[in-house]
């Protein structure tokens, strides 16, 4: 994996697609060699990070970007480093601006760059997000002040859309650029989510999370979904999501800035009465589901 990562760091634009195929192949080998689900998904995510960083760097070299600080951020499973072999894009862009007028001016420059990154990532196998949660969308290419205000509104005015957005955007990790810009958002989240005014938001998030239940019927039988002649269980929706949602809520409540589920449980779990054995058992169950999903 380290040798492949070194190839990615030195890659040209024309090399990226072939290297992405190698990452997919290596990911399958991880699963076949008996890696745990957690380790295999982390390894795939680590290599995907390297690919994405290289694409962003190459696009930045070819663009005439302004002097303003900026940061490309991963969201969702990419931020949590819990990606499987098939993944789509969830990303955003943060930049600094002195006021609203400058933010609009800078956005007009950053948007074409962000859209080119999204296009090249798509060419490399990272499918465009069906919900358009990407930096090339004007809604997710924002100044730091705009992101701060947006996060504040979601926590203090928890409408249904805000709760949905929180499950994606509050799993945020800087990938490339001025990483401190993302740290500011993490600090604000920790400050706001730990306050009394955020309790309604956290309760609503918990209520929403409880709608995801294991696919077990009243008689204890497994409930499946149908796709043509085949029946299946959506492991992400009815399995992994339960762990991810719980860890997110616990981390927000405890002021833990980390995005990955394992670290969230390790750091925030004790505040919710989980001992070391509880945490390891929980993570082991999630890892087993991740391995099946690979």
PLM region descriptions:
Residues 1-18, 22-26:
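Tandem CBS (Bateman) regulatory domains
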Residues 32-41, 94-104, 226-232, 273-275:
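Glycine- and acidic
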Residues 19-31, 37-54, 58, 62-64, ...:
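Conserved catalytic core of two-metal-ion nucleotidyltransferases
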